[in-house]
């Protein structure tokens, strides 16, 4: 690890930050993590570790116990290789080719104009740093690095029985220091499709592009309760309120880029009679001020644009336009229900994540999350009803299970005691409203004892993503102490 790419390699703990620096230099968005996987395989092989790969593409690395620790229970350190590729509209960045550019910003590390990939790159770096260490005491170690967690949990779905020998799994994909997770929400993707016909834009109409941007966005699980605006829903609300009075014809609607990120930006191309241009401008300006008044405490950066546009496309027919706008406006979004069992935790939510328009159809991609299967089913049923009323089709796919909390977890008790021993107070034991791979690992490995912990990462899945530097040291200290505290096999 002699080649460093940025100033972050000087931070402490040095081995972890140096690995993260290297990770940032190798492109690894979801579905394109092969170069990074290959780098890790080559490095681990050079170190003399036992390295394997399953048919799905997950990477397995084994490190023997340090002397005197051979009888400890085996531990699996786990992270995912891929990162969410999100950039600001004005950032020129190809996630499949260009390195992430991390830099130190006060107490934080962030990236220039893009997601940082601290989710889950810091966790992955911690696993590699344990492998590289010569002075950490630990029992038998396995590292499991999964692929494509962010875009479908492909690696976790593909994990089969027989590949792992450990008794305990430490998932490193949590994002708040001082919290340790023992359960998570399950989820399912929903895709609503509207078949549309088009008519020529009438003579005397002008074409405009309306843009709403500058919203915070964020993770559609961890941030769904924060009251942040959803650009798709907010632009849909404007159309629902004013399309008829403006005699507006919809040409295109596009917004968001990932089903699991709250959309920060949305764009519509519309045609209006030339004499209604001024009215459109007045109403859109008024709506912008309305949003600032409603959301200004949370959304401090709202901006809108109303610009001239040139299009060769035709407009939606009046009937198809009305069906789509009404359905988008009626579609539920955000927190559906808070948990009765765990105070302050979201039970069920929905994110209207991505809208795309093609010549003859519009697609709306949503992600439903819930701690309970019946909650998920209820929101599926609601979406089906909206689609049915609007004459749209809806399909659900990619369901993954939640991770049910285990009150008798031995590793949770060990983590709690270790944490209290270091800091003098207990950690917050939590259930997270997001998809962790642990729920899927329980299927091939039902007896695996698991916890999830990590450093403080703010605004994951958005270009504002940042990791708090001092919490990375705390996370590392906890990892080292935990490995030493693992009990012997019964």
Regions found by a protein language model. Name each.
Residues 2-107:
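Acidic/His- and Gly-rich active-site-bordering loop/insert found
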Residues 223, 230-232, 237-253, 405-448:
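Active-site-adjacent substrate-binding region
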Residues 100-114, 216-218, 420-425, 457-461:
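Glycine/charged-rich beta-loop-alpha catalytic/anionic-binding loops adjacent to active sites
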Residues 8, 13-16, 340, 347-349, ...:
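Zn-dependent metallopeptidase/amidohydrolase metal-coordination segment
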Residues 345-430, 434:
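Substrate-recognition/cap regions that form aromatic- and gly/pro-loop-enriched pockets
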Residues 27, 107-110, 150-151, 157-369:
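Midchain, well-structured core segments that form catalytic/ion-binding scaffolds
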Residues 162, 228-245, 274-277, 323-329, ...:
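His/Asp/Glu-rich mid-to-C-terminal helical/loop segments that flank catalytic regions of hydrolases
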Residues 69-145, 149-151, 156-167, 207, ...:
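Active-site metal-coordination/substrate-binding segment of hydrolases
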